[in-house]
């Protein structure tokens, strides 16, 4: 090897660890160093693992929010299109009367 520590495999967390991390994230999207140390000790994980879990979780949240926004915009476009069609329909009807 070239002296670099080999990259670790993917960390798998126990259900308990995940639940505790999610609970913490629910109250705080960012951790103080002090809190990170506390959680690391409580869950038998390293500070680095906690830090990276939170980074990944914030990214996941950002992606989810982006997806919701996209769905809402799509729905709005469809509503506007339907309103336009309805409007045209009514105008056509008015001409016939």
From Swiss-Prot:
GO terms for molecular function: DNA-binding transcription factor activity, RNA polymerase II-specific; RNA polymerase II cis-regulatory region sequence-specific DNA binding. PROSITE patterns: HOMEOBOX_1, HOMEOBOX_2. It is found in: Nucleus. Pfam families: Abdominal-A, Homeodomain. InterPro entries: Abdominal-A, Antp_homeobox, HD, HD_metazoa, Homeobox_CS, Homeodomain-like_sf. Residues 6-65 bind DNA. The keyword Methyltransferase does not apply. Residues 73-97 are annotated as: Disordered. GO terms for cellular component: nucleus. Keywords: Developmental protein, DNA-binding, Homeobox, Nucleus. Its main location: nucleus. Residues 73-86 have a biased composition (Basic and acidic residues). One of its GO terms (biological process) is negative regulation of transcription by RNA polymerase II. Belongs to the Antp homeobox family. Sequence-specific transcription factor which is part of a developmental regulatory system that provides cells with specific positional identities on the anterior-posterior axis. Required for segmental identity of the first through tenth abdominal segments. This is Homeobox protein abdominal-A homolog. It comes from Manduca sexta (Tobacco hawkmoth).
């Amino acid at each position: 090897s070239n002296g670099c520590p080999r990259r670790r495999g993917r960390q798998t967390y126990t259900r308990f660890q995940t639940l505790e991390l999610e609970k913490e994230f629910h109250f705080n999207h960012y951790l103080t160093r002090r809190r990170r140390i506390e959680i690391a000790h409580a869950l038998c994980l390293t500070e680095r693992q906690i830090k990276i879990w939170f980074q990944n979780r914030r990214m996941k949240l950002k992606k989810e929010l982006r997806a919701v926004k996209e769905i809402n915009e799509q729905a709005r476009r469809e509503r506007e299109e339907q309103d336009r069609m309805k409007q045209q329909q009514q105008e056509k009807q008015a001409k016939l009367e």
